[in-house]
Amino acid sequence: MIKTKKNRYEVYALGQHICMSPHKARRVIDQIRGRSYEETMMILELMPYRACYPILKLVYSAAANASHNMGFNERDLVISKAEVNQGTTVKKLKPRAQGRSYPIKRPTCSITIVLKNTSVNEEEFKRYQYTINQPGGLITKEKYTDMRCYDMYNNGGLWDKK
């Protein structure tokens, strides 16, 4: 099992054992990945696929988790990660003529929706640890550095000619 750090700006919802092929669910998930919450809700309500309803419920549940548990505003939420994995296959037998039976395989999938709060952009500020050698011993300090990327060619940089 891989342990990951919990991000305090992300909220997720997980749906398991959804009776649907993962290929059909991925067709819808690929359309909403990276979009805002409000835009995603409009897209899912208007798409004509059967896979939209369980995904709509998951996105709505993730947004409810974000607003209730973390206090995020729904206008600032963006779908940062959406993935569909294959679940277990439900196997049944269908009775046929003359005592025979045919197998029926119902595929299931698990869907994970991760919403990220964009009002606080954590990529702009990175935390660095550095050590200082002082007479009392080594001291470890944390420093927050602004890591925004400035385009020096278009914002009055060195070689900008007008």
UniProtKB/Swiss-Prot annotation:
Pfam family, one: Ribosomal_L22
Main localization of the protein described in the UniProt heading: plastid
Molecular-function GO terms, alphabetical: rRNA binding; structural constituent of ribosome
Spans through the membrane: none
InterPro entries: Ribosomal_uL22, Ribosomal_uL22_bac/chlpt-type, Ribosomal_uL22_bac/org-type, Ribosomal_uL22_sf
GO CC, one annotated term: large ribosomal subunit
Biological process per Gene Ontology, one example term: translation
Coiled-coil intervals: none
Superkingdom of origin: Eukaryota
Keyword field: Chloroplast, Plastid, Ribonucleoprotein, Ribosomal protein, RNA-binding, rRNA-binding
Subcellular location: Plastid, Chloroplast
Entry-linked NCBIfam families: rplV_bact
Family: Belongs to the universal ribosomal protein uL22 family.
Function as written in the Swiss-Prot or TrEMBL entry: This protein binds specifically to 23S rRNA.
Known partners and oligomeric status: Part of the 50S ribosomal subunit.
Name used for this protein in its record: Large ribosomal subunit protein uL22c
Origin species: Cucumis sativus
